[in-house]
Amino acid sequence: MKNYLCLTALLVAGCFAQGQAQDMHYKEPPKEIKEIALAKLPPTVLVSKDGKWLMELDNVPFLDVAELAKPEYKLGGTRVTDIFGPSRREGYSALHLRNVETKQTFEIAGLPSNMNILEAEWAPGSSRIALILREADGLYLWMVNVANKQAKQISKRKMNRTASQPGPMRGMNPAIRASWVNDSVLIVPAVPQHLGAMPTPPSAPSGPVIQVSDGKAAPARTYQDLLKNPYDEQLFDYLFTAQLVKVEPNKETELGQPAIYLQTTLSPDRQMLLTTTIEKPYSYLVARASFPKRTCVLDLEGKLIKEVDKQPMTADIMGYDTTNPFPRSFGWRADKPATLYWTEAQDEGDPRKHKVEFMDAVYQWAAPFTGEKQLVVKTPFRCRSIDWCDDQFALVNEYSRANRRMKISSFVPLAPEKGLQTLFDVSTDDNYADPGRPYKTSNQYHQSVVYTNKQHSELLMIAPGGSPEGDMPYLSRYDLKKKTNTILWRCQAPYYETIVDVVDPAKLQLITARQSNSEPVNYFWRDVKRKKNV
């Protein structure tokens, strides 16, 4: 019996010893695995507006443990941090400039060591670069002077980038990025001054969360990271509210009142600001983009010029080709100094209930917004986007999810009665038939417009080039009259090569990125007409 008791005591003592806290640390893998995991990634390359410079950004391969351990707030369908930025965004660890002509690479002086660049944006005149740097206590605005290769912080205010969502530049939503007024003046969303401390969670709920049904059965999507209670609403207000600030050399001006922004876009003439803001009441069933919203035009002092639209909460819409019954997709015409355009459903957003010839219509409204809206074009399918050129030529991209079709058509903005001229009508399931996208150039307003000749008879198309051998991207010339496509340049096996930019469309000079199974990404200057590669 005594032996049994002793054995039991030893076992219990062993269990307690095993249950004690231990000083554990993360361990590193073997050298070979570590080298593979931390191998340097190819840089992200952004071409300057004038085509003379490459901005090379070194990608961060992984987030470190300290970043992963930071609190993450899931609000309105978005994940953000307490420093008013997107959660778990890798960013960039270094920035270099490369001269396209000389191929010389330049280091940028003045940037902090161990920096993390969250966003980078060329100025319209290519003389400067705006940066958002992530530091331990917040996000800060910096500027790079391309001429002297110097960088400096240009505002002590913390930036608010909670509205920033993944996009073409790995974390930039074009709707809410920094807006260049000129090469030295920016409009940015900042953290409001005197904001106070972050709300603290209640010790107990103050009451139940009540949801009201209108008695009608309806399908609904399920989203993650939605608001769940009044405390989430307080956090949403605190973290997403931003103050627009005009940052000039040695001067900062607040524009209007703090608000929760979905969109801030400068007019092409840089005299007005289109804003879409979120208003209460919020919803626990849909993401923030479906909350009540107000769209306005402001001047550059923040004063209201015109309220363009106001919408209630839009319930989630289910079904092929269904859409918001309210005006949507507000923007500025790229070829005009200050003309708004938007899309309106002609079938109340539901083609199953309302059979119409045209699902959508696009309207425009020119500043000073005292006249009536004007029809620009009607589309049989849903309007996805418009690529502007001028009053005589534009392209509309439309789609039908129900029919799994995509169409690209041309039209005359000045004469909507002429209707559409279909250029491409393909199945969205047919990769081989994907026509790609039209090449766009910069106009007098530093806006991207469709590149074509004076007769509007030709386009340059950049296509993914789906084929039995895989994607083989190409550049082609499309004849608008004959509706024929001539390939001018194409990726050649065993490489995968994509077009980074068309530096000179008239001379057919390109910058491409080429890689293979054994070669990392490298960049080339290609003169298609002369068949020269550098």
Predicted features along the sequence, with ranges:
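Bacterial Sec-dependent N-terminal signal peptides
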Residues: 1-23
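Beta-propeller folds
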Residues: 17-529
